[in-house]
């Protein structure tokens, strides 16, 4: 019933609908044992984002030509804390993907036991093949539209695919200029302006810690094992460093 309603409301959003379906199937037995959950419409409230911002990002490339992209911020759930989730810059970005990521980010952040909600944002802008100046102008234009919806007690973005320390720095710089505040509104910043010492390695290290815990539940020691890693981006290099 819940999935049928979602499919009717959000046709074509395959990534988002698949993520919701997988979660619902995993909690079905427990949910059915608690009729009070259904009475309070817990699932219906959990699977829909609190709000979504969609906006045009207009910027000028190195040839002096005006370019336009779409920007998004999905503030999915802040039941236990401010919205928290990365910003992704990639040509494949669309609302369905960001809703799926924001939905799963809610659970991911809850598992940390820290007071963080779930959110996700991004744009169909691709940094690949762009100059530093073009990326800076895009990040500033992106933040010009989004800044009023962010804050340390409201929504705290981070990096993601296509968004590293450089891009976070450009966006945070614009945010500071617009708000006239130096607050903890972004994570993933450079060390020079408030970043964490081990942030670059954190995701890759965490992946290895997770794999090690999985193996330990089966009585297997990770020492001496061969680790296969695909790619060599923000996550892979940290995982490779920890694996060696």
Map each language-model feature to its residues.
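N-terminal Rossmann-fold NAD(P) dinucleotide-binding loop
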Residues: 236-237
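Glycine/serine-rich phosphate-binding loop and adjoining beta1-alpha1 elements at the start
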Residues: 90, 109-223
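N-terminal cap/recognition module
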Residues: 65-106
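Hydrophobic Val/Ile/Leu positions in short beta-strands of Rossmann-like dinucleotide-binding domains
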Residues: 227-229
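Aromatic pocket-lining residues of Rossmann-like dinucleotide-binding sites
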Residues: 243
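Structured beta-strand/loop patches that form or line metal/cofactor-binding pockets in enzymes
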Residues: 36-65
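Glycine-rich Rossmann-fold phosphate-binding loop(s) that bind the pyrophosphate
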Residues: 232
